């Protein structure tokens, strides 16, 4: 509902003032403000659990606020659904895209509001209007193409174009670059800036600090459900924003590299995957206590390396030698028995059972070892080991019966790492271990990884964040199109050198 009363000064497109929201026993929002100007890109920042999602759900009417006012284009609003918000000019591009993969691009653009000619859908008009919007936003996608054939970045372009078709004045973007290549990110930024030029106010949510400084004009920081500050980006530093988010100064983004790697524990020679296109002739050593990074552009086949080592992919050639003895991991069980562990890239889809508790999620990789002599599960040992995961990984939770899906991304990741440590691995492989995790939790994950290396674990980390690889690893193996293009020492290499190597075999 849009009220005709309470005009604003006209300086802001959206004004959320003094927003309060409580749930039983929890004050989720405490006097929170968010004010977005036209022709601006406004970062909304805070750790997971800071209140960002709750605030936006109050805006879209998914939650009803307890008190406070929301003005949009000078009029007080009180929406009761996301559909109502969209029809009135407020749109959101979610991290989990909301498109029908089996339908065409233009069907998705106009779903529920098809242009008609008599009793039938006017396909020609739908095509023309879709094409006109795409041309205006410089989007090169065939309106008739099935959405299921497109890349993630192209799907995001469609979501943005759909918002544009509703004449949205406020567009909220939630972690829009989490699965994009650098080239796709740059194209996305071009489109976002075009929306800004046309008078839109963009609310941009991201944990990637570099993007915030590259793209945004202002930032609002929330912490523990409270509004901390709204300031122009031009007057801030990365350290200042981090301090506002976590409530303390983080003197360093990465732990000190105090550990000295020991003898070689893993030798990989000419590793080639059976399924093609994939990795070819990959060779490297991993030392005891070493953190080895794997870098490369999207499509470089970084993940294929750890999946082949873990027995998910079958190798067609090459050798894997552990402590001087050649081994073959034909499946994940063999890999686990040989001391390998893999924390996968997609935490939500392949890492956790979101609706089950921390106890189940902590023990699932090792559940057979909890059977007693008569074949029953030893509940006492299971509870003890779950508590070990919670304590040693410093998981913030009310208890082991808590549903893991209710935890922050950082705490979910700690449970997954703890789960694998219960298998007592020698080689721990982590694929994008801090994706979607806030800055404070990232540092905690880095500390855990550094501590594991100090205890002699051999660690392999795949990451798309170059500062992360340079900050926590000892060496970086650079992949390009399935081939190793170089192995560099992080003490002496540069980001530009890694990018040069990553482009070598394209």
UniProtKB/Swiss-Prot annotation:
ATP binds at residues 46-53. Part of the ABC transporter complex MglABC involved in galactose/methyl galactoside import. Responsible for energy coupling to the transport system. One of its GO terms (molecular function) is ATP binding. The complex is composed of one ATP-binding protein (MglA), two transmembrane proteins (MglC) and a solute-binding protein (MglB). It comes from Escherichia coli (strain UTI89 / UPEC). Residues 14-249, 264-506 form the ABC transporter domain. Keywords: ATP-binding, Cell inner membrane, Cell membrane, Membrane, Nucleotide-binding, Repeat, Sugar transport, Translocase, Transport. The keyword Zinc-finger does not apply. Its main location: membrane. Its EC number is 7.5.2.11. GO terms for cellular component: plasma membrane. SMART domains: AAA. This is Galactose/methyl galactoside import ATP-binding protein MglA. It is a peripheral membrane protein. It holds the Pfam family ABC_tran.
């Amino acid at each position: 509902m849009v009220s005709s009363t309470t005009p604003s000064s006209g300086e802001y497109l959206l004004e959320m003032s003094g927003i309060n929201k409580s749930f039983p026993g929890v004050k989720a929002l405490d006097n929170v403000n968010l004010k977005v100007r036209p022709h601006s890109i406004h970062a909304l920042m805070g750790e997971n659990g800071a209140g960002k999602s709750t605030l936006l759900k109050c805006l879209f009417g998914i939650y009803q606020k307890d008190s406070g006012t929301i003005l949009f284009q000078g009029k007080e609003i009180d929406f009761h659904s996301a559909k109502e918000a969209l029809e009135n000019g407020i749109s959101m591009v979610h991290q989990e895209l909301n498109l029908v993969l089996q339908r065409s691009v233009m069907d998705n653009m106009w779903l529920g509001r098809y242009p008609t000619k008599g009793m039938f859908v006017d396909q020609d008009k739908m095509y023309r209007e879709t094409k006109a919007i795409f041309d205006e936003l410089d989007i090169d996608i065939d309106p008739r193409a099935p959405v299921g054939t497109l890349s993630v970045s192209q799907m995001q372009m469609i979501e943005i174009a759909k918002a544009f078709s509703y004449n949205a004045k406020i567009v909220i973007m939630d972690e829009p670059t989490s699965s994009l290549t650098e080239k796709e990110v740059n194209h996305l930024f071009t489109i976002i800036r075009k929306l800004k030029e046309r008078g839109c106010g963009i609310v941009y949510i991201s944990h990637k600090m570099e993007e915030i400084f590259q793209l945004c004009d202002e930032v609002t920081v929330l912490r523990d459900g409270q509004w901390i500050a709204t300031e122009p980006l031009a007057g801030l530093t990365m350290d200042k924003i981090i301090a506002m988010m976590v409530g303390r100064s983080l003197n360093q983004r990465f732990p000190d590299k105090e550990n000295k790697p020991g003898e070689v524990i893993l030798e990989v020679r000419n590793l080639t995957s059976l399924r093609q296109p994939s990795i070819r002739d990959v060779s490297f050593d991993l030392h005891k206590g070493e953190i080895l990074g794997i870098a490369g552009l999207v499509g470089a086949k970084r993940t294929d390396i750890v999946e082949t080592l873990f027995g998910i992919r079958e190798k067609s050639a090459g050798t894997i030698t552990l402590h001087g003895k050649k081994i073959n991991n034909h499946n994940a069980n063999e890999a686990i028995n040989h001391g390998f562990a893999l924390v996968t890239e997609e935490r939500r889809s392949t890492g956790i059972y979101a609706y089950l508790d921390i106890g189940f999620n902590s023990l699932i990789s090792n559940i057979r070892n909890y059977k007693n002599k008569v074949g029953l599960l030893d509940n006492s040992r299971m509870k003890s080991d779950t508590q070990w995961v919670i304590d040693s990984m410093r998981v913030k939770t009310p208890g082991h019966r808590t549903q893991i899906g209710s935890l922050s991304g950082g705490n979910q990741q700690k449970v997954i790492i703890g789960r694998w440590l219960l298998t007592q691995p020698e080689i721990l492989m982590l694929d994008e271990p801090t994706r979607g995790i806030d800055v404070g939790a990232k540092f905690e994950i880095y500390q855990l990884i550094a501590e594991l290396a100090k205890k002699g674990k051999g660690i392999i980390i795949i990451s798309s964040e170059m500062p992360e690889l340079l900050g926590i690893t000892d060496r970086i193996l650079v992949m390009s199109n399935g081939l190793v293009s170089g192995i560099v020492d992080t003490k002496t290499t540069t980001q530009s050198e890694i990018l040069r190597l990553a482009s070598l075999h394209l």
